[in-house]
């Protein structure tokens, strides 16, 4: 059976699972009892007493730690959104793993570690330019994405109602749904940017946990790591790596939007994907934000139409350039107050694209990440739906590569990240929404090699003359100065000589003053 066939079979099997056993949270925790107790501390293995792998020294059930420091920004409500103090609206106690153990039951290892005791360093997973992949490697990547689109996520399901309605009208049926591995990836992004639900048709839009603040870089880094690990398990290939798309071409064309890669435009309808591409049949989820707001509900993973791109009429818009990368990487400050889309001389804000590449602001200009999403248009143009387009994966992999390069060049201290007064979700110790088990922004503020991966890439450095050039320039300047100094001495000598000559040549009288009189 083909990979796609297996994916469809697994997806259908997943549909038969009882609702009490399935969530954005682990299935095992989405029971009425666990939700009422607000505790997600499942046992590891068959022994029910081995809670969080405690009998093996892997972890223990503990109270969730959340960031209580003040935030800034446009979100001014309190206790109105289920993402505040994440994930305390759902669970107060979760597994807290020790050492390099990780996962909702401490059954996994932290990124970059392996072995029965998670004490062995894994070989680094190397992310490469998608254009440098061999035909076989390219097909493996595309096959993995396609398989993930149609394979039920083995561990997690999504919530379809906000926290107050999670147990349904009778309080006896968790409002949750199965989804595929790739659609789960999409749902995570949607949930991080969705509006606060205050009532029918009353959304509060001034909130975003993964954009417009410092967490932009760490949130999307963890998002990719999560997908990469899911694809490694799905394919049985621990060295599987997400490639990147170097979009800094300065051109007005998408060179990954081909049928050999992520799909060209359809001839009879350029807003759709070519039927020669596997992605032409991809349907999207989490696109109807206004409808969810009107009905006070969440995206439930239902397909809502075909994937779209729309570059028609955008020929004047050009992608970022290598010079933009060079300027961005020259910014020494990670972020600056107010840690929002109007921060100046901020590497994060320049990379995200609210600022210009040199760190200055121009309300008429989009750059980098924001510019590329706008350039692709269609499904990619709106944050809540953008992750549906597989270009999202390679786009954000390259964005993360730039972030990693900046981290390696400047090696910032942890306090370069604001501990407080960033927008909600963006303080250093805030648990990133909606990842579970909880993980803070600080835990991802590292170089990529500390998280088990690296990039095969050479990014441009600031143009500085080499030491031989500097030495030549300095030597030349010294020679010029010496010559000028000698010339000045010579001219001064001539001036003095000319000024005193008449006194030297005068014939003095032997008469005294009194005698002349």
Swiss-Prot record:
A Pfam family recorded for this sequence: Tyrosinase
Ordered alphabetically, the record's keywords are: Glycoprotein, Isomerase, Melanin biosynthesis, Membrane, Metal-binding, Signal, Transmembrane, Transmembrane helix, Zinc
Task: State the superkingdom.
Answer: Eukaryota
- Where does this chain mainly localize? membrane
This enzyme's EC code(s): 5.3.3.12
Q: How is it modified after translation?
A: Glycosylated.
Query: What is this entry's stated membrane topology?
Result: Single-pass type I membrane protein
Q: Where does this protein hold Zn(2+) A?
A: 189, 211, 220
What does this protein need as cofactor?
Zn(2+)
Localization per Swiss-Prot or TrEMBL: Melanosome membrane; Melanosome
Membrane spanning residue stretches: 470-490
Gene3D superfamilies the record matches: Di-copper center containing domain from catechol oxidase (1.10.1280.10)
**Recorded GO terms, molecular function?**
dopachrome isomerase activity; metal ion binding; oxidoreductase activity
Mapped to this chain, the residue ranges on the Lumenal, melanosome side of the membrane are 24-469
Top EC class, one word: isomerase
Which residues does the entry place in the Cytoplasmic compartment? 491-517
| Reactions accelerated catalytically | L-dopachrome = 5,6-dihydroxyindole-2-carboxylate
User: Which pathway, metabolic or otherwise, does it act in?
Assistant: Pigment biosynthesis; melanin biosynthesis
Q: Which residues are glycosylated?
A: 170, 178, 237, 300, 342, 377
Q: Which biological process annotations from GO are given for this protein?
A: developmental pigmentation; melanin biosynthetic process from tyrosine; positive regulation of neuroblast proliferation; response to blue light; ventricular zone neuroblast division
Tell me the first and last residues of the signal peptide: 1-23
Gene Ontology CC, one term: melanosome
The family this protein is said to belong to: Belongs to the tyrosinase family.
Q: State the function annotated in the UniProt record.
A: Plays a role in melanin biosynthesis. Catalyzes the conversion of L-dopachrome into 5,6-dihydroxyindole-2-carboxylic acid (DHICA).
How does the record describe its quaternary structure?
Answer: Forms an OPN3-dependent complex with TYR in response to blue light in melanocytes.
Q: What is this protein called?
A: L-dopachrome tautomerase
Which organism's genome codes for this protein?
A: Bos taurus
For this protein's source organism, the top of the classification is: Eukaryota, Metazoa, Chordata, Craniata, Vertebrata
Q: Which gene encodes it?
A: DCT
């Amino acid at each position: 059976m083909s990979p796609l066939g297996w994916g469809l079979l697994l997806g259908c099997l997943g549909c038969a699972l009882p609702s009490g056993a399935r969530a954005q949270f682990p299935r095992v925790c989405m029971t009425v009892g666990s939700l009422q107790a607000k505790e997600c501390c499942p046992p590891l293995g068959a022994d029910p007493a081995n809670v969080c792998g405690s009998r093996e020294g892997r972890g223990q059930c503990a109270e969730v730690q959340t960031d209580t420091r003040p935030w800034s920004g446009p979100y001014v409500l309190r206790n109105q959104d289920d993402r505040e103090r994440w994930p305390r609206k759902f669970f107060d106690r979760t597994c807290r793993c020790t050492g390099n153990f990780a996962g909702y039951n401490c059954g996994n290892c932290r990124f970059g570690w392996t072995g029965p005791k998670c004490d062995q360093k894994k070989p680094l997973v190397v992310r490469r330019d998608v254009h440098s992949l061999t035909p076989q490697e390219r097909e493996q990547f595309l096959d993995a994405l396609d398989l993930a689109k149609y394979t039920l996520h083995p561990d997690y399901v999504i919530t379809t109602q906000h926290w107050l309605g999670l147990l349904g009208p009778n309080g006896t049926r968790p409002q949750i749904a199965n989804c595929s591995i790739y659609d789960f990836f999409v749902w995570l992004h949607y949930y991080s940017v969705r509006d606060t639900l205050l009532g029918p048709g009353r959304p509060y839009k001034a909130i975003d946990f993964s954009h417009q603040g410092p967490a932009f870089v760490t949130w999307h880094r963890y998002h990719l790591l999560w997908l990469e690990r899911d694809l490694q398990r799905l394919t049985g290939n621990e060295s599987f790596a997400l490639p990147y798309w170097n979009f800094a071409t300065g051109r007005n064309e998408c060179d990954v939007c081909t049928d050999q890669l992520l799909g060209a435009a359809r001839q009879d309808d350029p807003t759709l994907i070519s039927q020669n591409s596997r992605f032409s049949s991809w349907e999207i989820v989490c696109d109807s934000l206004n409808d969810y707001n009107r009905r006070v509900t969440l995206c439930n993973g239902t397909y809502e139409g075909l994937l779209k791109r729309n570059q028609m009429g955008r020929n004047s818009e050009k992608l970022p350039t290598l010079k933009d990368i060079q300027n961005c990487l020259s910014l020494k400050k990670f972020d600056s107050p107010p840690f929002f889309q109007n921060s100046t001389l901020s590497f994060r804000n320049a990379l995200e694209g609210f600022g210009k590449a040199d760190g200055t602001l121009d309300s008429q200009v989009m750059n980098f990440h924001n510019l590329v999403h706008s350039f692709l248009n269609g499904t990619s143009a709106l944050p809540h739906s953008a992750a549906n387009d597989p270009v999202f994966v390679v786009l954000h992999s390259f964005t993360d590569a730039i972030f990693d390069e900046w981290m390696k060049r400047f090696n910032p201290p942890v306090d370069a990240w604001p501990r407080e007064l960033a927008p909600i979700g963006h303080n250093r110790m805030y648990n990133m929404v909606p990842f579970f088990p909880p993980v803070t922004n600080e835990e991802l503020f590292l170089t990529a090699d500390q998280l088990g991966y690296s990039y095969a890439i050479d990014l441009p450095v600031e143009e500085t003359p080499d030491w031989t050039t500097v030495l030549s320039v300095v030597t030349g300047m010294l020679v010029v100065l010496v010559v000028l100094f000698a010339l000045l001495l010579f001219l001064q000598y001539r001036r003095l000589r000319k000024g005193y000559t008449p006194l030297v040549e005068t014939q003095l009288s032997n008469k005294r003053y009194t005698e002349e009189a």
